[in-house]
From Swiss-Prot:
Heterotrimeric complex composed of SEC61-alpha, SEC61-beta and SEC61-gamma. The lineage of its organism: Eukaryota, Fungi, Dikarya, Ascomycota, Pezizomycotina. It comes from Neurospora crassa (strain ATCC 24698 / 74-OR23-1A / CBS 708.71 / DSM 1257 / FGSC 987). Keywords: Endoplasmic reticulum, Membrane, Protein transport, Translocation, Transmembrane, Transmembrane helix, Transport. The chain crosses the membrane at residues 40-58. It is found in: Endoplasmic reticulum membrane. It comes from the Eukaryota. This is Probable protein transport protein Sec61 subunit gamma. GO terms for molecular function: protein transmembrane transporter activity. One of its GO terms (biological process) is post-translational protein targeting to membrane, translocation. Residues 59-70 are extracellular. Coiled coil: none annotated.
Length: 70
């Protein structure tokens, strides 16, 4: 019984230990890396916005034809 409890308690300890090791290895991105990531995210936003706009642009007239003016 005590072994089972010990095994259950070991899981959070190992998780915490691994998490601390991971945080210690992490580092902040330098300026060049940050700018590159920001540009990639911005490009993604623009592309997704354009796709959404085009879908809406096509959907509204198509909906008017199929459903009629409500």
């Amino acid at each position: 019984m005590a072994d089972q409890i010990q095994e259950i308690l070991d899981v959070p300890r190992e998780f915490l230990k691994d998490g601390i090791q991971f945080i210690k290895k992490c580092q902040k991105p330098d300026r060049r890396e940050f700018i590159k990531i920001s540009q990639a995210v911005g490009t993604g936003f623009l592309i997704m916005g354009a796709v959404g706009y085009l879908v809406k642009l096509i959907h509204i007239p198509l909906n008017q034809v199929l459903v009629g003016g409500a």
